[in-house]
């Protein structure tokens, strides 16, 4: 039961980035049993831990959550309306470019919302999970299939670390996008070349998996998720 519960939490977190305000560490799975002459009856419930609230730090009440959701809904609706008449590829490209230009990478990794869509679309400062969840959130809104992928990435310096990115489906094939790595941090007054901003945009397995290694392992106590099979070649 505990494993199934963890798997459900992991899957829910990947599929519903809009539920960013729930802190799963404040939730506990309670199992009650009652035995009589007819057998044993089990009741399962999810309850708040000693903290007494499911909400993440920074959101103290339902009013705070509703306000945040309204702000996100306005941003999502505005972007969706701008790309409403575009073909699927153009929708993906415009939303990708918007995120690259709009968000700054949180090098400190200390911000409360650094791993969610509120941190990305409202506060504009996140790490890789925030980028990946925002792409899924916006592509879901415009009808383009998109999943969040977890694993490790090896950068140009040869450093390997935990990472998150996306797979997107176009023309019935899946392609990889790493919005985070398309938005490198620039030190000084230099500008990012246009080619750098699309280096990890709609890539196939042959190129992308040289640096990205999907694990499907969201948490230590969960199962390994099976991801869609990438196209061998980049999108053309």
What are the roles of these predicted feature ranges?
Residues 130-207:
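Hydrophobic/aromatic-rich core segments of domains that either
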Residues 31-69, 75-79:
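Non-catalytic propeptide/linker segments at domain boundaries
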Residues 1-49:
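Intrinsically disordered, low-complexity N-terminal segments that are enriched in acidic
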Residues 112-126, 130-137:
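Conserved active-site-adjacent core of cysteine acyl-enzyme catalytic domains
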Residues 61-120:
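Secondary-structure boundary elements
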Residues 1, 63, 122-126, 150, ...:
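Alpha-helix capping and helix-loop boundary segments enriched in small/acidic/polar residues
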Residues 191-236:
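Low-complexity, Gly/Ser/Thr/Pro-rich intrinsically disordered linker/tail segments
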Residues 42-48, 118-119, 123-125, 173-179:
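Short, well-ordered strand-loop elements centered on a beta-strand within folded domains, enriched
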């Amino acid at each position: 039961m505990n494993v199934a519960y963890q798997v459900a939490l992991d899957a829910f977190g990947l599929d519903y980035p809009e539920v960013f305000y729930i802190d799963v560490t404040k939730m506990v799975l309670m199992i009650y049993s009652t035995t009589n002459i007819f057998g044993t009856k089990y009741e399962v419930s999810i309850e708040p831990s000693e903290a007494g609230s499911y909400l993440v730090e920074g959101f103290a009440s339902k009013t705070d959550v509703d306000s945040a959701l309204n702000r996100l809904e306005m941003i999502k609706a505005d972007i969706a309306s701008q790309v409403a008449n575009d073909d699927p590829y153009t929708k993906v490209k415009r939303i990708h470019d918007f995120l690259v230009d709009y968000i700054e990478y949180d090098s400190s990794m200390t911000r409360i919302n650094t791993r969610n869509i509120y941190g990305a679309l409202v506060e504009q400062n996140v790490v890789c999970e925030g980028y990946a969840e925002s792409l899924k959130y916006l592509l879901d809104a415009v009808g383009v299939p998109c999943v969040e992928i977890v694993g490790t990435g090896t950068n140009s310096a040869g450093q390997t670390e935990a990472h998150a990115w996306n797979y997107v489906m176009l023309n019935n094939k899946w392609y990889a996008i790493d919005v985070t790595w398309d938005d490198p941090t620039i030190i000084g007054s230099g500008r990012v070349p246009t080619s750098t901003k699309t280096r990890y945009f709609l890539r196939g397995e042959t190129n992308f998996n040289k640096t990205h290694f999907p694990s499907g392992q969201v948490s230590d106590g969960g199962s390994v998720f099976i991801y869609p099979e990438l196209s061998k070649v980049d999108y053309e």
